[in-house]
């Protein structure tokens, strides 16, 4: 299968708002991405970018956040490494929805569409466009030689709700869709006037339900290129029937977006690779049937989300998803086959251990001595998932429910014969958890900043440690009782 049939761009999306890797990780990863068939990066910095001047509070230059983002020198290094590897960079900066990283700050709280929610910016506030253009100006000026800019604009959860927007929508021929399109047009016109060489990409989801006439009358096709995103596997893949005819009549240039991670669960730890492969196979079919309708299909972004929003917990860490990314790129170029699977497996170091694309029953054997950057973290996460299964099996066991439930403990109505066997189980789990934490901390320090490691440990390991310690102490206290009711 000739990949060039479906556009010349194959962009790997790096969502840096969750677990941004250190620069040395990119030095190892970027050459591989080029080898696997990627042509560029869709770089979503969010709050890890070193914004300055009036925007200093939202980025990595603010003192309290220095450890979780990039310095100017590090950000430049990332761009340099990408360039050296022949990877074009397309920066992505949110300009409408998913604005939590800006609107959470007191300085810009007044720009929220709904005062208590920091997600969406108000398109009617006179200070909104100056803020958005300031974000764009700093991003564009930092990225030399870019040809495209992605301005996000997806999932605008709150639109047309403030008093001014409500009146504007009521007075408009097309209501809320006009509010959305007018904001995008204002941004796009600023970019065209200031950076006439830049082509502008937007996520397409807010456009899907809009009538052809609305899109046509706003001349949106003159200014932006939609990136159609759909991340589900074949069984749940569904785009509107009219999307290709409608978009091709409005937009001369169209993109697609698949997913290699961050799309099968908001707190997923390891990608369900089968689902991601299926997503890419279905996209290939979708494009095969419809791409001839499009004047020019630009290419595809392989998205890898790190958080579902700014406040969400981290989902799959990038090293755990490298096998999924490698296979999805291969599938995009050649289709899925046993031969493709084996080629990718061998290149990643799955020699003595099978390369599973279907989730395994846990606990499961863990591979070792793999060949991709960060494999040590990836197998550490496998260990964590194995451990979590053992932990849940223990704390939800019949033995605890039958002989040490809260009522029994509160009333000192426990059987010491049954409790004695629990102490070794809790002790063993705590010892293994300590080993797991030690291993993961060492391996993560090679790739991640301390702030991220602390968050991951605090989210995933600390609650289990607290619960096990509490259960062990409760058991010991019950065993010390000399009399029982």
Language-model features: locations:
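Aromatic-lined carbohydrate-binding surfaces of glycoside hydrolases
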Residues: 10-228, 258-271
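N-terminal carbohydrate-binding accessory modules
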Residues: 1-8
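Substrate-binding groove of N-acetylhexosamine-processing glycoside hydrolases
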Residues: 27, 77-80, 129-137, 141, ...
């Amino acid at each position: 299968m000739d990949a060039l049939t479906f556009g010349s761009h194959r962009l790997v999306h790096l969502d840096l708002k969750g677990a941004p890797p250190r620069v040395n990780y990119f030095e190892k990863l970027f050459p591989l991405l080029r080898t696997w068939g990627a042509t560029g990066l869709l770089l979503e910095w969010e709050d890890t970018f070193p914004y300055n001047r009036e925007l200093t509070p939202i980025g990595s230059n603010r003192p309290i956040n220095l450890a979780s983002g990039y310095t100017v020198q590090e950000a430049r290094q990332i761009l340099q490494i990408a360039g050296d590897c022949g990877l074009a960079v397309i920066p992505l900066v949110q300009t409408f929805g998913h604005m939590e990283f800006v609107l959470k700050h007191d300085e810009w709280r007044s720009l929220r569409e709904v005062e208590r929610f920091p997600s969406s910016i108000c398109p009617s506030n006179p200070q909104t466009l100056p803020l958005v253009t300031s974000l764009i100006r700093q991003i564009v000026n930092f990225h030399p030689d870019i040809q495209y800019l992605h301005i996000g604009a997806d999932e605008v959860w709150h639109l047309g709700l403030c008093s001014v927007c409500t009146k504007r929508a009521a007075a408009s021929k097309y209501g809320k869709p006009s509010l959305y399109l007018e904001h995008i047009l204002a941004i796009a016109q600023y970019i065209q006037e200031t950076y006439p060489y830049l082509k502008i990409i937007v996520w397409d989801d807010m456009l899907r339900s809009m009538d052809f006439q609305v899109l046509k009358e706003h001349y949106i096709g003159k200014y932006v290129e939609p990136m159609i995103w759909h991340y589900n596997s074949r069984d749940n893949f569904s785009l509107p029937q009219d999307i290709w005819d409608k978009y091709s009549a409005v937009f001369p240039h169209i993109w697609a977006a698949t997913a290699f991670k961050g799309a099968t669960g908001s707190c997923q730890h390891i990608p369900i690779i089968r689902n991601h492969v299926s997503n890419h196979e279905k996209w290939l079919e979708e494009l095969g049937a419809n791409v001839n309708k499009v004047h020019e299909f630009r290419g595809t972004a392989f998205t890898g989300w790190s958080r579902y929003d700014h406040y969400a917990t981290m989902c799959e860490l990038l090293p755990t998803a490298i096998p999924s990314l490698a296979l999805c790129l291969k599938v995009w170029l050649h289709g899925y086959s046993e031969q493709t699977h084996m080629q990718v497996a061998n290149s990643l170091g799955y020699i003595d251990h099978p390369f599973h694309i279907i989730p395994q029953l846990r606990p499961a054997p863990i591979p070792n001595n793999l060949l991709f950057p960060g494999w040590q973290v990836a197998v550490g996460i496998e260990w964590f998932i194995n451990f979590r299964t053992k932990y849940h099996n223990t704390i939800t066991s019949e033995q605890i429910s039958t002989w040490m439930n809260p009522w029994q403990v509160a009333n000192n109505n426990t059987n010491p014969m049954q409790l004695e066997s629990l102490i070794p189980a809790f002790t063993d789990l705590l010892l293994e958890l300590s080993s797991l934490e030690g291993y993961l901390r060492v391996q993560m320090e090679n790739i991640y900043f301390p702030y991220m490691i602390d968050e991951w440990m605090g989210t995933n390991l600390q609650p289990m440690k607290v619960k096990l310690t509490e259960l062990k102490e409760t058991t010991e206290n019950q065993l010390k009782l000399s009399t029982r009711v």
